Structures are given as C-alpha cells and as structure tokens.
Amino acid sequence: MLFRSNKTNPSYEGIDLKAKPSDTKDSKYNTEYASNEITDSIVGVLCYSDEITDDSQCTSQGSGIIITSDGYVVTNSHVIGNSKTLYLIQIVTSDGKQYKAGVVGYDTRTDLALLKMDDASGLKAANFGNSKDVALGENVIAIGNPGGIKYSNSITQGIVSAVDRQSSITTNVKFIQTDAAINPGNSGGALVNMFGQVIGVSSSKIAATDYEGMGFAIPSATVKDVIDDIMKYGYVQGRVMIGVVGENVQSRGNIPAGIAIYSIDEDGPCGNTELKQNDIITGADGKKISNFAEFYDVLESHKAGDKLELEYYRTSDSSTGKVTITLQESK
C-alpha cells in the first residue's frame, strides 16, 4: 500500500492572514526574531517509492510549513509527485521527530499540496501574514531544507525584489520575487517577513547563472485560497479541467508551440473526441495557446458545464483541427 488515507476537515476556519504589528519600527523585528518565530513550524518532507526503513532511499524531498497544531502541513505539489498515491511520505520536524503522513489534496495549477501527519499534536503552527501588504525592498528570510534534510532549517536573507511576477510557463500564479537564496530542497518552505509571518511558500528558482539571485514564492493570499478549499473539500472548488496530461512544447520547424497531449482521460471532457495522443493544443476560446500558463488564464473565466473550443495540431500528418468540449469540475 503506497499511501495512507487522510480526511478533510470541513470545520477548518481557514488560514488567518495577520496584519503587520502596530510597532513595526521596533528594533526587535529582525532576522533573529523572524528565525526564532518560524523555525519550529518548518518540516522536512521525504517521499519514498517503497516502505520506509532505515535503509530506504527517498525519491523526492522538500520542505513544508505546519499550519495546525495537529499536523496539517503545506508543501509544493511537485514534491509529492502531483499525486495522492505515488509515494509514502515521512515528515521530519525541527526536533528530529519522524511522522508518517498522507496527502489530503493537491493543486497542480498553483503547485500547492496539503499533507496530514499521523498521530501529531502540540505542534507549533506558523503565523501567516498578508502578501497583499508586502512592500518592495522589505527584508525577508527564506527557510527550508536546501539540498535535503541534512541541511534542515537553513536560513537565507534577502529582500522582496518584486511582486505579481509571472515566472513560469506552467502556472498562472503571480509570484513574490526575492533575492534570498532558494535552492533545491527549499520547495515548500517559507518566505518570512521580519515579524515572523509567512508571506509566501517557496516554489521555484530560475536555475541559470545569468539569473542568480532570483527566487520565487507563492503569495500567502493564494496559499490561503487554495489550502482552505483543500482542507475542507480535498480539492479546489470551481476549478475546471479538460482531462488530459501534457507538457509545454516550443515551436520547431513547422510544428507550433502549445501543449503536447501525452494521455487522455476517456471519462473526461476530451474523451471520445477527435483529440489523440501527441496532438498539440494550440488554441482555446479563439486565443492562441503556447503554454499551460496561457491555458489556465482561459480556464479561469469558465465554470463546469461550459463549452470550450480547442484548436489542435496533429503531429502525425501536420493537419489542424478544432473540437468543442464540455468542461468538468476538477476534483
């Protein structure tokens, strides 16, 4: 059995986005204060393909943020393989204690996931600030496990370099940009202001030497919207899907950019249509689509039951076509 079942919590009141304290100019609010406030709320997330033993090698690892005293943890969806069942999951807290955990739900569109630790109590939940109050140039720290659990609770310092930054062609999330170092293993960790409040969940880093010093975090306001729904329902309400698995592809020769289809859910909106594996989605609603970020922007304006016209390119014979589907709720 490769997963543990975890229930939602319909009575959850939601992540509380706190305002900055009134005495913001007090000198006590510095990196040391912020570090002390957040350290015990950061965990390591270790994912295993097989049973967890002392000799097991983890397949994926990242960081997470405790949001309730009984062990609900926010992390990135890609850390857990964008799946409820792919991995056995172990959580390691700041004091070295180990817990088994399961996936409550995940959202690939924002790269967020919610985990539940087994038999956990008395944990320190992180305080969250409101990312809408973030100021350019504001001092921040990033905390997580860069390079894995052996470097747990590593802290780097920086500033808020930009807000509402589109940094990825796989999501339409508008990120907080920082120059605080965010390295592999930091995924799912916290970006924290000097008041010890989480203002973002670390998600990605442009891994190129020309762009050193550009880290990105999912804003806490987005985290609240997504995680509150997952906690209550196990998924994000109101999201629609087309029922395909695919990947962004760039144009090459006569082949256009778009979303290459790897598989189609026969029970989904694209099942029993003319679309085939290896077709490339190039348009939706009359708009050109070259990546998932653009496609998600189109889907945001639709609800389950809406009709959506897709344009596609067939790689097998270089033909093009259109198909109309009925959108379903993504659960």
Language-model segment annotations:
Residues 2, 43-45, 64, 71-75, ...:
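Terminal peptide-recognition signature
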Residues 3-63, 228:
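N-terminal activation segment of mature serine protease catalytic domains
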Residues 19-21, 68-150, 290-292, 309-311, ...:
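Conserved active-site neighborhood of the chymotrypsin/trypsin-like protease fold
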Residues 25-33, 49-72, 97-100, 125-127, ...:
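A conserved glycine-rich beta-strand in the N-terminal activation segment of trypsin-fold
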Residues 30-34, 146, 198-253, 300, ...:
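C-terminal cap/linker of serine protease catalytic domains
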Residues 51, 181, 229-298, 306, ...:
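PDZ/PDZ-like groove recognition
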Residues 51-53, 57-59, 79-88, 123, ...:
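Active-site loop architecture of trypsin-fold serine endopeptidases
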Residues 67-68, 128, 134, 192, ...:
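Short, well-ordered loop/turn sites that connect or cap secondary structure elements
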